[in-house]
Amino acid sequence: MFLHDKFGRAITDLRISITDRCNYKCVYCRTGNEGALYGDLPFEDYLRMARVLVSLGITKVRLTGGEPLLRKGVVEFVRELAKLRPQGLKPAFFSKSNGTAEAEPFQNEAEPFQNSDPLDIALTTNGHMLAELAQPLKDAGLTRVTVSMDAVDPERFARITRVPNGYDHVLAGIRAARRAGLWPLKVNCVLMRGFNEDQIIPFGMFSREEGVTVRFIEFMPLEEGRTWAPSTVVTLDEILSRMAEYRPLVEIPHGRSETARRYHFEDGVGEIGIIAPVSHPFCGHCSRIRITSDGKIRTCLFSVWDHDLHAQMRRGASDDELEEFIQSVVAKKEERHHIGEADFVPASRTMVHIGG
């Protein structure tokens, strides 16, 4: 039986945080806390979770943190993940314009099909340690990589991350990933008003010069300082308006489960994506669940509760029992988030402790 929630959304994407430790102290993310709050698990436990979930229809696994490259043994973990083969799933929903989901008119449930493709394994990293690990990770079976990078000016980058000389390490990591063939290679930038919105056009130039996809992300209320306010959000429409001052953009058709609106420059050189969960929610076609570094399932970034999968394993649950537990959790997946609404309740964990 494949995973789908009560709104008909097929769950095919899994994010696993393998640590909530990070060697960066980005000012919008952490307020001085450098250590892990929840700890992490042996890789064999994450591997078992992934194996059970792949048997339920997961086709994409993204490793996150914290900073996942801090974990010794991450290359071998990727190698073991790459041995898994997804079952495949045909989604059974379409997205309405208001961000909610409805069942397909002529399809009542998700239909399995034979999938011979390998598991799609991705990694989100700050890139500081990527230069030396890009090729080993590619050789182990990593498919693609996303680098978090909030400025292309070295001095601004150092002020944001509170790490001196970090920019050069990250740029070297991006270039090493490109040489290794980790593709598509994406660079994510969280935009905050009064902080780094002046980096929009420089990032457009960076995309063209470095041959990467730059994705701007609207600032979400997931930071440790709880300083988020609607006024801090640089919206999709504003990003497009500013980028148009540099060069015209042409929208690229995208899949319904993609989080980003995608654009390329008019001459075809350089790609920009915009992830706009605040101004343009995409909850109606969400296909994701997350596992935190301490082994708990989260069905939404903004969940106010966790579901302890690792506790089931500690109690000696069989794979069949884990499948039943996972299915019961997915059935409770939220329809949408409530950012900006009067009844919004902040997530029970901040982003670094959920997994970016």
Report residues per predicted region.
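Short glycine-enriched, charge-decorated loop/helix-capping segments at active-site entrances
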Residues: 32-40, 158-165, 228-231
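Canonical Radical SAM [4Fe-4S] cluster-binding loop centered on the CxxxCxxC motif
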Residues: 6-45, 55-56, 301
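Radical SAM enzyme core and accessory elements
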Residues: 1-4, 280-356
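Radical SAM enzyme [4Fe-4S]-AdoMet core and its adjacent flexible, acidic
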Residues: 155, 164-168, 175-271, 277, ...
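N-terminal [4Fe-4S]-dependent radical SAM core
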Residues: 1-15, 25-27, 55, 60, ...
